[in-house]
């Protein structure tokens, strides 16, 4: 049994409140490796529902290890069967990747959108955004192969760097695609930028963008203007973060300038320790 399998996804499902003003409720299902994305997605869906606008979100999600539990896996399959949007990220555990593929493949055509961020090739093939799929990108196979290779390396190579490499490579491929496919590919790139940002606000705008482009009908799209979908907020790949600072710092000099000019604290006592933590980027943003 996995350490995660005592948690039922049904206990954290996000649904619109009763007597809401939503004209359409969109069902989204996700599978992720990192729990911080689970938290951000939950808050993003709640934020959309609390606006009580034309669109509501019914969100259910799983950490990938939770799918080892038979009941969770059956719940996942039932959720997928009625989903509008499916999202997955960092699915690199082979047996669990196969479970995801087996659950989602029969319903891929029914999904309005399926967005798969770097995962094993068979999972990446579940991507579906309009006319775009990863299979259409001639270089996608080698890029994904590189991602898997780096994931397995023991020299400390950053898997995050590999994700960013994929993001940076895709624009150069777009010029070889027909216009319609290029537009959908750009949506995938934009989705990736929202995802790498990882904040509640970024993921809220990600869900709204996908809903607007692929789920809701034309007569409702004008009403989405009240949501004011924002561009992705980006963060540096490497940096220094302080909980009291207004932003992340990209250099030690920037951080020291801010620290030395703070007026919200007393001059430092020489005996006061400074504590630094080394964290993955996704744990901060």
Regions found by a protein language model. Give the residues of each.
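An N-terminal assembly and electron-transfer interface module characteristic of large anaerobic redox
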Residues: 1-285
